[in-house]
Amino acid sequence: MKVIASTLRKGNVVEKDGKLYVILFAENIHPGKGTPVTQLDMRRITDGVKVSERYRTTEQVERAFVEDREHTFLYSDGEGFHFMNPENYEQIAVPEDVVGDAAPYLQEGMAVMLSVHNGVPLTIELPQRVTLEVAETEPVLKGQTASSSYKPATLSNGVRTTVPPHIAAGTRVVVMTADGSYVERAKD
């Protein structure tokens, strides 16, 4: 289906020269002089090569039909990351390069959105927030309640982030999956 280039967003899949590309970054640029353009950073699905393209904002681009389905993460092994469709219990193995930066945040039983084109997994979308345990951080210092400074911490999945001074090792915290930033102390 043809769409105007300016409507493309991160995660969309486009077809160019018979090959499929997933959009990693999309930006509409409106210079003071000249025609507006849409800058797309894409990854070719077949071999993972990154490509950068510029289109006029009114230019038509072929968008591939992609099915977004909810899947449950089961486990990972040498073949990749294994997910199950909760509707028909069908399992699918997703290669490591498709999962990418999402790998540390995957937890057994987690529901994720998987984009599939002709049975081939293209992209994975995590929930916005996940709850993880702080594995290691500096000790809590008394009297540091007034400052808004944060201290470095390592989470149970190996991701490094910054947390408020009152958070100690072993505390469960909620973090954003997009950038690993601290949101709040877990309520459970």
Curated annotation (Swiss-Prot):
Family per similarity comment: Belongs to the elongation factor P family.
SUPFAM superfamilies reported in the protein's UniProt record: Nucleic acid-binding proteins, Translation proteins SH3-like domain
Main location per the UniProt record: cytoplasm
Name of the featured protein: Elongation factor P
Record InterPro entries: Elong-fact-P_C (IPR015365), NA-bd_OB-fold (IPR012340), Rib_uL2_dom2 (IPR014722), Transl_elong_fac_P/YeiP (IPR020599), Transl_elong_KOW-like (IPR013185), Transl_elong_P/YeiP_cen (IPR001059), Transl_elong_P/YeiP_CS (IPR013852), Transl_elongation_fac_P (IPR011768)
GO terms, molecular function: translation elongation factor activity
Tagged with keyword Cytoplasm: yes
General function of this protein: Involved in peptide bond synthesis. Stimulates efficient translation and peptide-bond synthesis on native or reconstituted 70S ribosomes in vitro. Probably functions indirectly by altering the affinity of the ribosome for aminoacyl-tRNA, thus increasing their reactivity as acceptors for peptidyl transferase.
GO biological process: peptide biosynthetic process
A Pfam family of this chain: EFP_N
